[in-house]
């Protein structure tokens, strides 16, 4: 049975590589196309499975009854992800994302959510999915519909599980509207734009203080992109600088999916019994290694992460 269950989107990504982004009304040639599996839920599940091994990570989501779904299931199984928690619907197409990527690795994403919107709260109460949630020590929440998020967070806490949440676009709803979810979250993993949307604050400590009024035990983890990451909770503040890819002879190719690689590695490290700081350092390294790969789901294998582990950036810890 799995150590981690991930609840989130499964998409088919069409990556369009261009020299630069077009202006409105302008046509820009596409240099190459890469069609690859994606979706934040699936990406995080695969990232964790690559580090933990076969059958250690389950994905709970929804696909259409189409060719994309068949490809997705095969790919996920090949990656060692438990797919028994995936629902199929005939009322919507499988999710798809159309991603423009420029020469600097920056991206613009347009998404058809499709079947991802069909995972409902009542689906989580079926015995097949409840058995996955009961078996897991960590539940990672990503981007199902709001009602399903609330139900998932509640069930996870009911079972006494560690809950991690990448709030993503839900952060625009604000902390007050999301407080029923936040009360059940142990680790909130978001970026700078999302923390501002969620709390109205750009200062990480002030943002955590606002969140702690809802949940005193919450740990805020900020993904800072090319500046590394940081973590704040009741006990400590910690920051991890970026990995110097140039020193390793590596370069940025595609930043799409690096946050998913980060979260998957953090969850996997915690599931292995590692502490917050070591898990944060490993997650930071995994995210950095992902940007050197062109595919959305380019998270490192266990062997790759271990090979570069000695080059990981070390955390600076401030005890409060």
Stretch-by-stretch model annotation:
Residues 85-89, 99-138, 142-143:
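Conserved phosphate-binding/catalytic loop of the ribokinase/pfkB sugar-kinase fold
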Residues 9, 61-65, 88, 101-103, ...:
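Cofactor-binding loop segments of dinucleotide-utilizing enzymes, especially the Rossmann-like FAD-
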Residues 1-62, 67-74, 78, 249-252, ...:
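Glycine-rich phosphate/adenosyl-contacting loop at the front of the ribokinase-like
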Residues 75-91:
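A glycine-rich helix N-cap at a beta->alpha junction
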Residues 48, 191, 259-260:
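Short, conserved phosphate/pyrophosphate- and ester-handling motifs at nucleotide-, phospho-/glycolipid
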């Amino acid at each position: 049975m799995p150590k981690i269950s991930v609840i989130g989107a499964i998409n088919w990504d069409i990556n369009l590589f261009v020299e630069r982004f077009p202006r409105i009304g302008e046509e820009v040639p596409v240099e190459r196309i890469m069609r690859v599996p994606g979706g934040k839920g699936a990406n995080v599940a695969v990232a964790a499975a690559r580090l933990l091994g076969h059958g250690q990570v389950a994905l709970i989501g929804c696909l259409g009854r189409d060719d994309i779904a068949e490809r997705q299931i095969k790919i996920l199984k090949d990656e060692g992800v438990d797919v028994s928690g995936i629902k199929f619907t005939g009322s919507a197409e499988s999710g798809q994302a159309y991603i423009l990527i420029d020469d600097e690795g920056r991206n613009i994403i347009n998404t058809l959510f499709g079947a991802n919107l069909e995972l409902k709260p009542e689906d989580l109460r079926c015995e097949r999915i409840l058995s996955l949630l009961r078996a897991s020590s960590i539940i990672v929440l990503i981007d199902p519909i709001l009602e399903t998020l609330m139900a998932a967070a509640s069930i996870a806490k009911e079972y006494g599980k560690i809950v991690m949440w990448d709030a993503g676009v839900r952060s625009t709803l604000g902390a007050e509207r999301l407080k029923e979810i936040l009360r059940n979250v142990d680790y909130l993993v978001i970026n700078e734009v999302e923390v501002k949307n969620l709390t109205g604050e750009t200062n990480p400590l002030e943002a955590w203080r606002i969140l702690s009024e809802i949940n005193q035990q919450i740990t805020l983890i900020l993904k800072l992109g090319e500046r590394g990451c940081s973590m704040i909770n009741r006990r400590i503040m910690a920051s991890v600088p970026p990995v110097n890819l140039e020193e390793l002879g590596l370069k940025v190719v595609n930043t799409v999916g690096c946050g998913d690689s980060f979260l998957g590695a953090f969850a996997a490290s915690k599931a292995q019994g590692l502490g917050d700081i070591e898990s944060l350092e490993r997650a930071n390294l995994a995210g950095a290694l992902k940007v050197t790969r062109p595919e959305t789901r380019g998270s490192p294998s266990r062997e790759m992460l271990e090979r570069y582990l000695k080059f990981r950036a070390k955390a600076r810890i401030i005890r409060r």
